Amino acid sequence: MEPCVLIKIMGFFKNRTARLFNESLMKAEQGIPEFQVIVADMFREGAGTVSDNQKAIYWYEEASNNGNTEATYKLGVAYFRGDGVDEDIDKGIEYVERAAKDGYKMATKTLPTMKAFKQHQKLVKKE
């Protein structure tokens, strides 16, 4: 494939992604939690907009406060890793526990590993 064709294709997708971001942002601002998660993901990845972890966290918090368990899980992971926020393993586990309690399957799968990591950290500090 010709390089100029690839550039045109990449430009096409970049424009579509930016439009998708703007449309999703309008719906997120209306308080629709599913779009709040999409906007948060796009900020986190820099898809259709500039990457901004703090804005991603803001939108995950909004979606979580609006009852979206995926956002609650992603907030927990962010706090656990210190991704866009100060690392707080306990707070991360709290969010993931809440998402697991609300039936989010990925949270149920991730939670034991997070708790094991926390226990490992405690043991290492004792040494």
Residue ranges and their predicted role:
Residues 29-32, 45-47, 52, 65-68, ...:
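Short helix-capping/linker turns of helical repeat alpha-solenoids
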Residues 87-105, 112:
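TPR/TPR-like (Sel1-like) alpha-helical repeat modules
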Residues 38-45, 74-81, 113-117:
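Hydrophobic face of amphipathic alpha-helices that form TPR/SEL1-like repeat modules
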Residues 12, 106-127:
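Terminal, low-structured helical/coil segments at or just beyond the last alpha-helical repeat
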